[in-house]
Amino acid sequence: MNLLRPKLKYFILAILIIAADLYTKYLANTYLEFAQSLKITSFFNLTLLYNHGAAFSLLSNDQTSWQMIMFSTISLIAAIVLIYLIIKQPITEKINLFSFALILGGALGNFYDRAFQGYVIDFLDFHIGNYHWPSFNIADSAITCGVVILIAASLFTKKKS
């Protein structure tokens, strides 16, 4: 346990992301009408949607049980790999640890939805005029931020010789 103590904050971050994700999805599901946009700004709405597909609603028209099982399994495997990476990553690799925690929290937030509801709740709707970016949620945001940070770190960090 002493080996994990310095990394505890990264697991706490993942748990906080899961909590924020599930709570905001609960609020969206409770207070928003399905597929009805609540205008917040000229470029942002809250719109409750149920995503049976992958990220950004890919494959969402094919609502089969194999698809739910496949996406749930992928999320669970990703979470296990990320937990392993956090445990094995040197404590000095803070950017990687932070990124892994973001991705882990997001993966588990969406896994929960798929496993217990059969779909992921999306509600954040950004748009320019009539062009809408696919709706997403806090978990998707955490995953995206984690991946972008990992890519940026790999591009802009000098390798140790």
Swiss-Prot record:
One of its GO terms (biological process) is proteolysis. InterPro entries: Peptidase_A8 (IPR001872). GO terms for cellular component: plasma membrane. Pathway: Protein modification; lipoprotein biosynthesis (signal peptide cleavage). Signal peptide: none annotated. Keywords: Aspartyl protease, Cell inner membrane, Cell membrane, Hydrolase, Membrane, Protease, Transmembrane, Transmembrane helix. The chain crosses the membrane at residues 8-28, 40-60, 67-87, 91-111, 136-156. The active site is at D122, D140. Its EC number is 3.4.23.36. It comes from the Bacteria. It is a multi-pass membrane protein. It catalyses: Release of signal peptides from bacterial membrane prolipoproteins. Hydrolyzes -Xaa-Yaa-Zaa-|-(S,diacylglyceryl)Cys-, in which Xaa is hydrophobic (preferably Leu), and Yaa (Ala or Ser) and Zaa (Gly or Ala) have small, neutral side chains. It is found in: Cell inner membrane. GO terms for molecular function: aspartic-type endopeptidase activity. The keyword Cell division does not apply. PANTHER family: LIPOPROTEIN SIGNAL PEPTIDASE. This protein specifically catalyzes the removal of signal peptides from prolipoproteins. Belongs to the peptidase A8 family. This is Lipoprotein signal peptidase.
